[in-house]
């Protein structure tokens, strides 16, 4: 905008100073054909630029409102994401969650191994479908992750605390079900042998919107995890001061 303003100012300045000083000081320049022409040109340019800037500002505002109000498939409001050192046991996770929930600002907390919304998924697993290998995004979570993030299970059941005692269980999104023709109770490769599909959840956007939907699997590792969560997703009460919650 600054460069545009400078360029627009250069020509009128050069054009006006090209006239004899006597003509300008006597006031005849304004009424002259050249004066009328340059005045009309400047008014026209100012009008066009002002209109263009207003349109651009409105477009940016509409785009911002669209992105803020777009249904991502999960409840993104009142969520704090905290990267932390990996826990060493489920008991440590439970103790940390209980401590958080002592504060009335905090409703619940879920945990996962990495960022939920990211353009680069850290883990992708492979599934054989129609004699072809197809990949899907793989995300290891705590048993209450879908509940805390507001992701609806549309078929089967959600994870439960008892799933931490099993050898791993899956919940896929609807996009994965469509792509791979998956079924409830179907068993796929897990980290510790075969793991069943216990449910399917509503589609959601785990990447920025320009990437579209992807086949996605939530996974509770069960009794013998190879790793523990490194990210906490903390749901706070509506109206909570985020700084106060983070300080806690």
State where each predicted segment sits.
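Glycine-/small-residue-rich active-site loops that bind phosphorylated ligands and cofactors
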Residues: 33, 88-89, 177, 241
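Mid-to-C-terminal secondary-structure elements
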Residues: 95-248
